[in-house]
Structures are given as structure tokens and as C-alpha cells.
Swiss-Prot record:
<feature type="domain" description="Myosin N-terminal SH3-like">
    <location>
        <begin position="27"/>
        <end position="77"/>
    </location>
</feature>
<dbReference type="InterPro" id="IPR027417">
    <property type="entry name" value="P-loop_NTPase"/>
</dbReference>
<feature type="binding site">
    <location>
        <begin position="174"/>
        <end position="181"/>
    </location>
    <ligand>
        <name>ATP</name>
    </ligand>
</feature>
<keyword id="KW-0968">Cytoplasmic vesicle</keyword>
<feature type="modified residue" description="N6-acetyllysine">
    <location>
        <position position="102"/>
    </location>
</feature>
<feature type="compositionally biased region" description="Basic and acidic residues">
    <location>
        <begin position="1122"/>
        <end position="1137"/>
    </location>
</feature>
<feature type="domain" description="IQ">
    <location>
        <begin position="779"/>
        <end position="808"/>
    </location>
</feature>
<keyword id="KW-0007">Acetylation</keyword>
<comment type="subunit">
    <text>Myosin is a hexameric protein that consists of 2 heavy chain subunits (MHC), 2 alkali light chain subunits (MLC) and 2 regulatory light chain subunits (MLC-2). Interacts with RASIP1. Interacts with DDR1. Interacts with PDLIM2. Interacts with SVIL. Interacts with HTRA3. Interacts with Myo7a. Interacts with CFAP95. Interacts with LIMCH1; independently of the integration of MYH9 into the myosin complex. Interacts with RAB3A. Interacts with ZBED4. Interacts with S100A4; this interaction increases cell motility.</text>
</comment>
<dbReference type="InterPro" id="IPR008989">
    <property type="entry name" value="Myosin_S1_N"/>
</dbReference>
<dbReference type="GO" id="GO:0030048">
    <property type="term" value="P:actin filament-based movement"/>
</dbReference>
<dbReference type="GO" id="GO:0030036">
    <property type="term" value="P:actin cytoskeleton organization"/>
</dbReference>
<keyword id="KW-0832">Ubl conjugation</keyword>
<feature type="modified residue" description="N6-acetyllysine">
    <location>
        <position position="8"/>
    </location>
</feature>
<keyword id="KW-0130">Cell adhesion</keyword>
<dbReference type="GO" id="GO:0005826">
    <property type="term" value="C:actomyosin contractile ring"/>
</dbReference>
<dbReference type="GO" id="GO:0005178">
    <property type="term" value="F:integrin binding"/>
</dbReference>
Amino acid sequence: MAQQAADKYLYVDKNFINNPLAQADWAAKKLVWVPSDKSGFEPASLKEEVGEEAIVELVENGKKVKVNKDDIQKMNPPKFSKVEDMAELTCLNEASVLHNLKEXYYSGLIYTYSGLFCVVINPYKNLPIYSEEIVEMYKGKKRHEMPPHIYAITDTAYRSMMQDREDQSILCTGESGAGKTENTKKVIQYLAHVASSHKSKKDQGELERQLLQANPILEAFGNAKTVKNDNSSRFGKFIRINFDVNGYIVGANIETYLLEKSRAIRQAKEERTFHIFYYLLSGAGEHLKTDLLLEPYNKYRFLSNGHVTIPGQQDKDMFQETMEAMRIMGIPEEEQMGLLRVISGVLQLGNIVFKKERNTDQASMPDNTAAQKVSHLLGINVTDFTRGILTPRIKVGRDYVQKAQTKEQADFAIEALAKATYERMFRWLVLRINKALDKTKRQGASFIGILDIAGFEIFDLNSFEQLCINYTNEKLQQLFNHTMFILEQEEYQREGIEWNFIDFGLDLQPCIDLIEKPAGPPGILALLDEECWFPKATDKSFVEKVVQEQGTHPKFQKPKQLKDKADFCIIHYAGKVDYKADEWLMKNMDPLNDNIATLLHQSSDKFVSELWKDVDRIIGLDQVAGMSETALPGAFKTRKGMFRTVGQLYKEQLAKLMATLRNTNPNFVRCIIPNHEKKAGKLDPHLVLDQLRCNGVLEGIRICRQGFPNRVVFQEFRQRYEILTPNSIPKGFMDGKQACVLMIKALELDSNLYRIGQSKVFFRAGVLAHLEEERDLKITDVIIGFQACCRGYLARKAFAKRQQQLTAMKVLQRNCAAYLKLRNWQWWRLFTKVKPLLQVSRQEEEMMAKEEELVKVREKQLAAENRLTEMETLQSQLMAEKLQLQEQLQAETELCAEAEELRARLTAKKQELEEICHDLEARVEEEEERCQHLQAEKKKMQQNIQELEEQLEEEESARQKLQLEKVTTEAKLKKLEEDQIIMEDQNCKLAKEKKLLEDRIAEFTTNLMEEEEKSKSLAKLKNKHEAMITDLEERLRREEKQRQELEKTRRKLEGDSTDLNDQIAELQAQIAELKMQLAKKEEELQAALARVEEEATQKNMALKKIRELESQISELQEDLESERASRNKAEKQKRDLGEELEALKTELEDTLDSTAAQQELRSKREQEVNILKKTLEEEARTHEAQIQEMRQKHSQAVEELAEQLEQTKRVKANLEKAKQTLENERGELANEVKVLQQGKGDSEHKRKKAEAQLQELQVKFTEGERVRTELADKVTKLQVELDNVMGLLTQSDSKSSKLTKDFSALESQLQDTQELLQEENRQKLSLSTKLKQMEDEKNSFKEQLEEEEEAKRNLEKQIATLHAQVTDMKKKMEDGVGCLETAEEAKRKLQKDLEGLGQRYEEKVAAYDKLEKTKTRLQQELDDLLVDLDHQRRTASNLEKKQKKFDQLLAEEKTISAKYAEERDRAEAEAREKETKALSLARALEEAMEQKAELERLNKQFRTEMEDLMSSKDDVGKSVHELEKSKRALEQQVEEMKTQLEELEDELQATEDAKLRLEVNLQAMKAQFERDLQGRDEQSEEKKKQLVRQVREMEAELEDEKKQRSMAVAARKKLEMDLKDLEAHIDSANKNRDEAIKQLRKLQAQMKDCVRELDDTRASREEILAQAKENEKKMKSMEAEMIQLQEELAAAERAKRQAQQERDELADEIANSSGKGALALEEKRRLEARIAQLEEELEEEQGNTELVNDRLKKANLQIDQINTDLNLERSHAQKNENARQQLERQNKELKVKLQEMEGTVKSKYKASITALEAKIAQLEEQLDNETKERQAACKQVRRAEKKLKDVLLQVDDERRNAEQFKDQADKASTRLKQLKRQLEEAEEEAQRANASRRKLQRELEDATETADAMNREVSSLKNKLRRGDLPFVVPRRVARKGAGDCSDEEVDGKADGAEAKAAE
């Protein structure tokens, strides 16, 4: 019953179609179609034609109406009603197509073929045509075998993917509500059933289940109820289902496009938001509601219309289904709960209410319960959330400020947050589904893509979302038109088929350009993006700009009245659409509150934080607010580069999708909406007609009918249909094309039904299906014949078996009858009893011998069985190995094919890379030198940093020492106040110097700001250049399209050069691919350039800061040189410690040597291990750890040495403290220390900054190193893959070497074709040069176009000025009223004239429309007539075929009759032979009967005689017994003869019956042949007449074609003249370009010279600075020596004073003690001696002081000289600095000049300069990469060499294994040979046994013959006995005596003979 119900909605009712009454009515009434307002078209009968009008009678009401002839359309015969393929209609027009679709729709047939695609009308009800049984019905069937269905389309796509190995796509297109989503689901259902790896119906695979469950999840979250559709997809999706080589599903991937996220916050009237919101609120349990804080429907603001229900759907049940689908998809419960929390959070966001405060515009949140719920659900802090919305932190300059938000801003922020949250959740869900669907490890070979995207939408007012959706549908419709109409016809021309290009007028490119064109003039999306950049831009300004730029576009319209709400209109292919541009700028930028975004990123809920992980890519509201304040594009820059608008992202996504679809074979399904009321069984004809016109259905049918939609490659055609032409192709090699020509000749196809191209055979619609049917019939015939042979063979076998059984039965019967006769005979019984006794002894011996033989035989049998089992096991092993080898071979072949492809790609890549390498090798050396120079500078900087660190450490120690001394010096500060005043003066001087330095720093900062402004201006220029590049690319594309059109026209004319055009198209495709690659590379290059610029600026900043630090450090060094005197004394201790340090270093080097040795050992071990990478990495890590440990030890030792140094310094300080003479100087030093401490604090601050910058540089360096390592890893992986590929290549090479032998025979045939190819290549080269010239010309045209555009702008400006002048003149004209009146009269006259002209124009337009209609009608009629003509030709060709087939049949029948005659003659001859045999057998039988009668008579005589003998004598018993035996034998012979006679009689009867049958059949066949011959003769005469008519018609057509060709030749000549003019233009443009390039090269050379001069000045400056530093160091050392000398002089002066004091004291004592006595004389002498001694000492000290003074003077002189030198060096440095500044100024001036030059050149040559700059940057970047990669490559080469050694070792091992296997195989073969020999010996023994058996049989036969001879003797004796009595006695006695003398052996022998006789 279910099947019958389904058939009703699938198959057409044949009784309705074949109604003869309807056919007669149609023919009688001349029915036609007439336009109708109600039903589109209605039937009417044509009554009368009057001029251009016709009178028709409407069928419905019988009214007569006058109609224009052009409006009448022909009606098809009733047999074409509800036709499955509308391409079969005889009259193809809108009315017929609409009627066919309507009839089928009302009958429940929703699917109809329309040529190559399928049309589906939404039934708005469930139909029983999608069950598993229906799927099985369509599985593997051809399209024409089953009625139209979505399953049929899917199955053809699947089968063509499997056969052609080409990716497929199924595009379901149509308006919203047409049924695209449902058909997509059915496609997935069919594929999941057909391509499932689990073949049982009950057990479906997990992947297939998940694939089927992906749609319900996506529908729940992405679909919604709209006015047109209850389950409208509010996003687009492209489902890619991947299949493996066997056709099983291995995975899937879903890509989504443009989710309508605004539906989450507001909906139109009677519409719903996304289904999941209603599912959750209806289906959630109480526990879940409390957890998710759910409320009733009317409590949510975001549910605009409350609870809107969908008829026939329960939201509660759908919730359970969605949750079950997520469970099947493998989404865990935690993630499910996370999704539901986010949904509830989105709803709660709508409930947050803001109010405006009284006095200010600031927003406030009076009730924060909703905010608390939101923060609870999303895991964030409430206060932070409310603060982030009401008073977010906004960046102003470099600071962050909290800005209060207005109510409108807060509401916008909440809505934006809700939309973004839902969109991110949806994107996460799609990624999660893709992860689940793509988890299989099997490799996907090809895929089927299913596109389900939002249909065309036309509302009252349409927004940005509708523009994107309609733009997508325009692109898809353009793809359909391109594939159906343009690519189809281009393929005809490529293949060299005679074809006139038909322009169907369905090009949608103008509308697409209006939306997407980037420049010249820019499209709507480009203008929207541009407006987003401008400050104070509004939606109104955007609309004004659109009207200004695109106001004159044919597809663009302004609103006609001011009352219209729409801002502008676009004429799409589906109709005119009004757009309202409210909030388009915001929608395009899609801004967010970045405070809330960061808060959500830091959420405690893992799911929410995962959704908001890419916070750094969003556009903040502060950036959008900045639009009104700043004009800089930098305001829109995020952390990772410039932001991308929604329009840009969607455009890129769409371009990617279109590229994917173009690379597949598309299968179109056109979905049609029958009505807007969503009612079943209702069809609005006007709505359907509009959709048919838009979708290009009629044009698709027309090209399908006129063109050749079916095409087959030569080889495939030969392989598939050679069975239909078995003997047409000769044996041996033949070209595919020649073979196809011969096959088509043999098939006798009409020449109009096919065309033979260069590589394919093209057929009209239906021809291939007919061939397929014939092929199926042929195959069935072959299989029937094969079955008949098999059945005959089996029957013969069974018959032979039955015959054997019959003969066996007869033998058994005979033996049984003989046994029954002998059973009751007494002698037999005695014989049976005696015989075993006699044979016992003999049997025992025989048994012994037999047992021995049996034992031997059994042993042999066991041995043979063992051998057999061994052989079987060996065979099974060999079979298994064979299977394994076959599998490996198959895998290897597949791998080989893949490797071939890979090899081709790699070779192409290799060639490209080699070219790039050759280009870059010249610059590598320069870059290496530059790198070395930079490394040297880096080393210098590191050395400077180390020196600074050491000085800082010394400062630290000095500071500690001074702090200790500070306590002792505080008491003496009062004495040093005068010195303090001096120091204050010095401080003032230092302050002045500090101010000077600060001024210099300010100058540097201003320079830095200027540089930043320059960088910004450069960024602006870069953006402009990028925009210009995009414009030029768009123009290039447009020019390419124009060039393609020119080439198409040229292809029409140049029919002979089709092959060359094919190759040009291929080259263009390659160029397009290269351009795409170039664009990608340029994008990467620009990104890299941006990074390089940033790094360069950072580097310059760092260098500037380092220079400042160096200058400050040099100043500090001058102050610190005074402390170095104390350090010189500690140098000895330091040397000792240095020796210890060197010892430690030697120890460290020893340890390093040991580690190196360990590493070598490890590397040797690693060679033996298979996985080299892991072990190497582990060893590297351990090695690094050891190095770090050694470094730590080294640093510890250094620290210990530093501590010891510090201790020595402290000792030295304590010793110096003892010197009291230095107290005055210490005070001075204390003051200096204060200054130094301040300076040191500043230096430490700067040092920290420098260290931070250094760390940043190191981080960048580490990042670069990481990138390099990643690249190295990739290179290693590629190297491994290359090695694998090389291994596979070697295998493939070995195979190819085998194949070369086969190809050698073909090479001779290929030489001729190669010569032709060379000629074609030459022509191609010439064409390619022409093509290049055309491209150059195109570029020049572009430049001219730009100049013209500039001129146009200038003219527009002039026009504006003129308009202003006109307005002024109008004001003046207002004074003259009289003039106005005359002007008004003139105006009225002009208006009247204009009205008259308008009327005339309208009349002309109407006439033109009429002419167009007549033209279209006539064209359609012409097409119909052509179709009829084709049909008639086909019928004629079919009749000719039938005639030829009839002739063939007749010939076959004649041959069959001849065969039958021969068979009859043979049968008659056999019958005669059998008759003669029968007669001879009858004679033989008569003779046998006679013999039998004689034998019976003799038998009777013998019986009587026996009785007599028995009665008379007992002695003769034995002889009587023998006679009875002979009698029985004779009786048996007689019976055998009888049976033979009966058999012969049966055979004779059978032959007679067969003879009669043959005669009857022959007579019947003769009569049938005569009748058929008469009928065929009549048909052939009629066909000949028809053919003559057709030939005449064809001749007329041929003449028309000749005329057209002559016209085409004239047009071709004109085009060639135009081409020459264009070439002249190209030459001039090339000259201009060369001049520009020369100027550019000159500028570049000047730039290089400037750069070199700058480098020289820098080097000289650095040398001067180094000399100045050295001089300063010398001066400081001299100053230190001078101070030391001054200290020594002071000490000497003190000693001198002490000595003088002592002398004075002694003199006083002498004077006082002069009056004492002689006792004091001795004391006096002693004292005088002491004085003399002291005087000597004083003289010595004076000499010393003089020497010291001399030295001091010398030191002062040296200091003065050093100061003069220093001043000279400073003046030199100043001069150099001035020179540098002057050079920088010159450089700036040159840069300005260069920019001016570039500005002048850019107007003409922008594209070339940008390309060159991009190439330079790209090459520099590539050079850096190459240097890095070269270093990595060296390492990889070493690794690869090691691997190669390992591989060689493995190869040697495998060779040994192979040799072992060969030895084993040889042993097995020898063993097999031995077994064979043993078998042969056994067979010989069997033959010997058979020979012995035969010998025994011969002996037995001899014995029987002797027995017969004895019987004969007995019979002769009997005869003699009968003759007389006397002689009878003697023999009787003799016989008695003989009987007495007879031995037992003779008796036994006689008995044996009798037994043998009986056995016979």
C-alpha cells in the first residue's frame, strides 16, 4: 500500500496521457495559449487571422477575443502533458512550461527535469516519497530509468564522482520558502544511506548518524519563522561531505555564511527569533529553569512578539530532539549546559533597563536584577559589568579615562553584546560539529558539496543583511548562467565544433559590479568601507556618495518621490529591491564595548571565556567614537593590524565559496515557491512565471535542445560501446578518434545527432540514453546466449550420467537374472561349496602378498598424503602471500599515482623556486655582508654594555666606601665651606650643561615626533597605494573579461584555430592562478614589511637611547677616572685571581670537551635508532641544561672573585683612611659624590630602560629564532616526505622502465603528431606574444582611462563653476520680468514639443516592443521548427537504420535458411544412412532370428539327446552340464541381440519424427520470409521518398550557411584591421613605460648613493668618537698621576716644616744651655751632629720637592696639551655632527624631491612602482628567509647524510633478506620438483599395476578361449556318438577311463571355465 501511495506522487498516469479524445480535440480546434491576467495563460482555439491580429475563442467560457499574433503561443499535443523532462516539449514557450509544471503540481508531481537541471515546487505538505524503500529504488539507477526526484540528482552526482573522480556540488537555489533546506536534508539522507560503510539497514555508522543529526542542531540555532517560511534558514551553509576511493563517507565539514544575528534582539511582526529560544523555554524542566533563571515568554524584551507558535510543531518535543542530536554529535553535558546558559544570558541582556538622569544625559541603571542574572549566568562580576556599560574606560591619547554613557549608547552596547555573544556561540557550535564530523583518519579522495544559502529576499524595506543575501544570490545565478550558457558554448568552440555563439542576455555582471566593484567607480560595499574610514560620516553621507558615484548605473535607481522611505533601489535579476541605509555603517563595522569583552574573556565560566578568547581583534566603541574627532586611520587599528569590516569579510568568504564551486561539477536544483500564503495545492502562475524567467529555465531548456549536452571522452566511448560494433575496429593499435569515427559509422547515427571534437564525442540530448539501452539489450542477449550454452552443457552432462546409469542398471539386471537361474542348480551349489575349500591355501598366500602390498601402498599413501598436506599448506601460504602482494601492488599503484601527481607539483614548485633562487643569489652576498656588519655592531654594543656593567659595579663599591667615610667627614664640613662655594659654582656650570642636554633631548623628541608623523603619512600613502592596487586589479579583471569576449568573437570567426584557443584558455587559467598566488604573496609581503618597519623604528629608538646612554656614561667615566688610581694598586691581586679564573676556565673547557665527546658517542648511537629527531631533541635539551649548569658554576666563580675583589678594595679603603693628609680632599670628594649619586640614579634609570629595551629585542630575537626553528622543522618534514617520494619515484621509475619497452612501438606513430604539435606550438608562441602585446596595450589603456578620469573630474569642477555662474545669471535675470514671460512661453512650447516627442517615443517603444515580441516569437517558432527538423531527421535516420537492420536481418535469415537447408540435407543424409543401417540391422535381425530358430531346434534336439543320455548313462552327465552352459550363453547372446534391435528401432523412429518436424518448420519459415520481404519493400520505397525531400531541404540550408560564412569572413577582416591599430597603440605605450622605468632606475641609483654617503659619515663619526674616548681616558690617567704627585709634594712640605721646627727648638735649647759646663759640650756636639743630619735630610727633601715640582709642571703641560687635543677633537666631532645634520637635511630634501617625483610619476605609473617596491621588499624578506633556511638546510643535509647511511644499511639488510627469500624459494621449487617426481613415479607404478591387470585379463580371455575349444570338442564328440553304436563304445570307455584318470586340477580348470562362462 505504501509503495502504491508513493507511486502516485512519482509516476505519471499513462491513461491520462494516451487519451485519443484529447488528441483529436487538440487537432480539430487548433488550440493555442493566450495571455490571461488570472492564470497567466489560458487555452483558446484559433478561429481567424486578420492582419497582425487574430480572433480566438476561449475554451473556458466560449468568448471570442481579438489578440495580437505576437502574444499567441503554440500548445503542445496532449501526449506531452506532465512530461518528465521539459526539453522533450515540441513547442517550447513560457505557457507550455507553466502548464506542464502546473499540471504536474496539481497531480502531486513536484519534481520535473528542465534539461540538465531539476525544478522543484514546494508542496507545503508531507509526501510519502522519501522513505528507505524509495532510496533503494533510486540507488544505482540511471536518470532516464526513474521518474524525476532529488534522489536521482544526488545519485548522478555520486556516480559521476566515483567514475570521473571529479568533485561534485549540488546547488539548491531559489527564493525564501521554496524548499531549499528540506531538499538539502534529503540529499544528505540519501548520501548517508548510499555511501555508508555499514551496509546493514539496522546498524548505521556513527559518522552517518552524526551527519544526519548536524542539520537539526544547526536548524535549532540558525533557523527561524518568517512571513514567507516557517523554517527559514537565517544563515547560509556549504556542507562538504568527503568520500574515500571506495565511495564511503569519511568525514564532513560545514562552512556558514552571514548569520542574521540582529534577529536575536528584535523581530518583525508575526515572526520569531531563532528556534532554540522557544525550544528552551518550552522544553526545560523545573530544575533546569531554576538553574538557568528562566522566565515566561512575555517577560523577555528580546522576544518581540512573545510566544509565536508554528502549526504542526511542538517546541517541547523539538527541545528533546535537539538535546538528543547534541548527545549523538558527542557534545558533552558541560558544553551543552554552557550553551544553554549563554542563551539564557542573551535573553536576560534584553531585560536590562536604562534611564536618563534628570539634569544630565548620563544613563543610569535603576534596577540591576537583570544585570545580576546576566553576570551569574556568564560568570562575571556585577559591579565591573555595570561600570563597563555605564562608565567604560576609554583611551584618550596615552591615558585611560572613564566616560559616562548616554541611555542610547548603553542600549546600543547591550544589544551589540547580545548579538556578538550569540554569533560567537553559533560559530563555536559549527566548529564543534566540524570537529565531530572530521575525526576519522581515513583519507578523503573527493567530495560532494551541498549549498543551502538564504534565498532571494524582497521586503517592503530591505537592510544591509538583505543586500548581502541578494548579492550572494546574484553571484550564484551568475555561476549558473556562466556554466549553463557560456562555458557550454566555449567548450564547443574549444573542441572545434561548428557552433554559432548564442547570447541569451542573462549576464548579471553589471549588478554584481554595482555591489562589489572596488573602484572606477567604486561599488556600494567599497563606498561603505570607505565611508567607515571618514570622520563624522553618517548613513546619509553614505547614501549621497552612492548616488553621486553610481547615479547613472543602469541597475541603480534613486527613489522617484520624496515620500518614499527607501534611500536607493537596485534592479536585481529577481526584481527591483528598495534599500533603507539605516545603521549601515555600524552594521558594517560591528563595534563592541571592549571593557565588557575583556571582562567576558576573564569570565570564571570556561565556556564563556573560550567564546571571547580573541578579544584583541574586536573594534571598540571608543574607536567608533573617535571617528567624529580624528581623521587618522590609525584610530581603527587594533593590536594585530587593521580591522576588517563585515562587508569585506563576507566578500572574501563568498569569493572563496565561488572558487570552490567553480572547481566542482555543479548540479543545479531550482526551488520554486508556488504561493506566499504557504497553502498546499495552490499555484500562483504569475509568481511562478517570474521565478522561471529569473532562473533562466527556458534558456536552459533551449541550449539543452540545440546543443550537445552529453559528451564522452574517446577512450571511454570506445571502451563502453565497442560491444555494439564488434567487427568495426580492426585489430592492432588505432587512435581513439579514428576508432570512435569507425564506431559511429557502424552505429549508423545521423550526423546531426553528434559532433566529434578534439578529445570528446558530443551527443544531442537522449542519444546517449538510446545507446545505453542498446548496450543493455546487447549485454542481455550475450548473457542469454551464455546461459543457454551453460544450460546445454549441464543438460548434456546430466544426459550422459543418465545413460551411464541405464547401462549399469542393465548390467545389474543381467547378472541378477543369471544368478537366479544358477541359484537352484545342484551342481552350482556343490561348486560354490567346494571351490572355497580348494582356494583356501592359495588365498592365504595371496592374502599375505596382498597384505604386504597393502602395507606398502598404505605407506606410500601416507607419504603422498603428507606431501599433499604439505603442498596444500604451501599452496595456502603462497596464495596468502599472493593476495598480500596483490594488495601491496594495488596500494603501490595508488601511491605511485599520487606520487606522480606530487612529483609533478614538486617539479613545478622546484622550477619556480630555482628561478627565485637565481634571482636572489646576487643579493645574498650583499645581505650576508650587511648581516656581518650588524653582528659586528651588536658585538660592539655588547662590549660597551659589559664595560658599563663593570663600571656600575665599581660605582657600587665606591658608594659603600664613601658612605663609611661620610661619618668621619661630617665634623670637618665646616672647614670646607669655601670649597663648597667653589663646588656650587661648578654645580651651576653642570646645571647649564644639563639644560643644554635637555634641549638636545627635546630636539631629538621633536625629530622623533616628526618621524612618527612621517611614518603615519607613509601608512596613509600605503593605504592609498593598496586601494589603488585593488582598483587596478578590478580594472584588470574587467579588461580580462573584455578580452575574453573579444577572443570569443575571434573564435567564432577562426574555426580552424580552435586548438590554439584551447591552449590560450589554459594559459589564462594558469595566469589567473599565478595572479592569485602573487596577490597572496603581496599580502604576506605587506604584512612582513609592516613588521619590518615597526622593528626598524624600535631599533632606531633603541639605538638613539643607547647613544644617549653612551654619552651619559662617558660623562660619568670622566668623573669616575679619579677613583682608578686606587684600583691600580689592587691590579696585582686581580691578576692572581684572574689566574685562578683561567684555571677554572680550563676546567670548564675540559668539561665542555667531555660533553662534546659524550655528544659524539650519542650521535653514533643515534645512527642505530630509527627515530632520529626525538633523540636528537632530547640530547640537545640535556646538552643545553649542562651548559646552563656550567654557566651557573662559572658565574658563581666570577661572583666569588668579585667578592674577593671587593674585600681587597675595602682593605685598601681602610689603609687610605689612615692618611690624614687627604681629609681636605675628601670633603671635596663628598660633594662630588652627591653629584655622582644623582647622575648615577639617572644613569641607573636609563640603564633599566635600556635593559628593558634589550629584553624586548631579545624577545623578538627569540621569536625570530622560534620561527626559524619551526621553518627548519617544516623543512625536515618536507625532506622526509621528499625522501619518501623519491623512494616511490625510484619504484615508479623501475616500473616506467618496463613500460618504455611497450612505448617504443608507439613512438614511431607519435613522430608525425609531434611534428604537427611543434607547428601548433609555434603558432601558440606567436599568439602568446600577441597576447602579451595586448596586455601591455591594456595597461596603457588603463593609464589613458585614468588620465581621462582626471580630465573628467577637472571638467566636472569647471561645470560646477559654470553652474555657479549660471545661478548668478539667473539672479540677474529675475530683474527682467518681460524676458521671463517670453522664456515661459518658450518653455511651454518646448514642453509641448517634449510631450509630442515623448508620445512619439512611447509609440516607437511600443512598436519596438511589438517587433521584439514578434522577433522572439519567430525565434521560438524557428527553434521549434529546428527541433521538429531534428526530430524528422532523427526519424529518417532511425528508419534508415531500421531499413539497414531489416536488410541485415534478411541477410541473416537467408544465411539461417541456408544453414537450415544444409541441416536438412544433412538430416536427410543421416536418415538415409540410418535407413540403410536399419535395413541392414533388419536383415541381421532376420538372420539372427533364423539362427535363433535353428538354435532352438538344436536346443530341443540337445535336450532330447540329454534326456536320452541321462536316462541311459550317468557318465555323460558332465558333458550334458557343459552343453547346458553353452546353451545358456547362446540364450544370453540372443537376448542381447534383441535389445540392440529394439534400440535401433527406437532411433529410427526418432530420426523419422525429426525429419517431419524439419520439413514443417521449413515451409513455415519460407512463408514468413515472403510476407516480411513484401512489407519491407513497401517501407523502403516510402523512406526513399522522404530522404529525397530531406536532401533538398538540407541543400537549401547549406546555401544559407555559405552566405553566413562569407559575412563572417568580412567581419573577421575588419577585426584584424582593428587589431593592427591596437598593436600600434601598444607600441607607443611600451615606449612611454620604458622611459618611466629609466627615470625610476636613475632615482634608485641616486638613493643608493645617498645611502652610501650616509654610511660613510656614520663610520667616520664612530671613528672620531672612539679617538675622543681614548684621548679622554689618557687625560684622566694623567690627571690621576698629577693628583698623586701633588699629594707627595704636600707630604714633603709637611716633613720640611717639622724638621725646621725641630731645628729651631734645638737652637733655643743650645742658647739656653750655653752657660752650663763642659757636661753640655758633648750634648752640644751630639745635637750639632743631629742638626747636620737633619739639614742633610732637609736638602734632600728640597731636592725631592724640586723634582716633584718639575714633574708637576710637566704634568700640567701634558694636561694642557691633552685639553687642546680634546678641544680639537670636540670641534672635529661638532663639525662631523654638523656635516651629518647637513647630510640628513640633504637626505630629507632628496626624499621630498623623490616624493614629488613619485607623485608626478605615480599618476601614470603607480602600478609599476608599487609592484617594484613590493618585489624589492619581498626579495629582501625572501633573502632573510633564504639565509636562515640555508643554515637550516646545511644541518638538514648532515642529518640527511646520516639518514642516507642508515637507509643504505637497511637496503643492504633487505637485499640479504631478499637473497634469503630467493634461496628459500629455490629450495621450495626443488622440493616441488621432487614431489612431482614422486608423483610421476607413483603414476608409473599405477600404470604398471594397470598393465599387470590387463595381462591377467588377457590370460583370463585365453582361458575362456580354451574352454570354448573344449566345448567345441565336446559337441563334435556328441555328433560322433549320434552316428553309430560301435564306435560309441570305445570312446565311452576312453571317456570313462579318462574320467577316472582325470586329475583335480583339470576338474578345477573346467569349473573355472564354466564359472567364467556363467559370469559372461
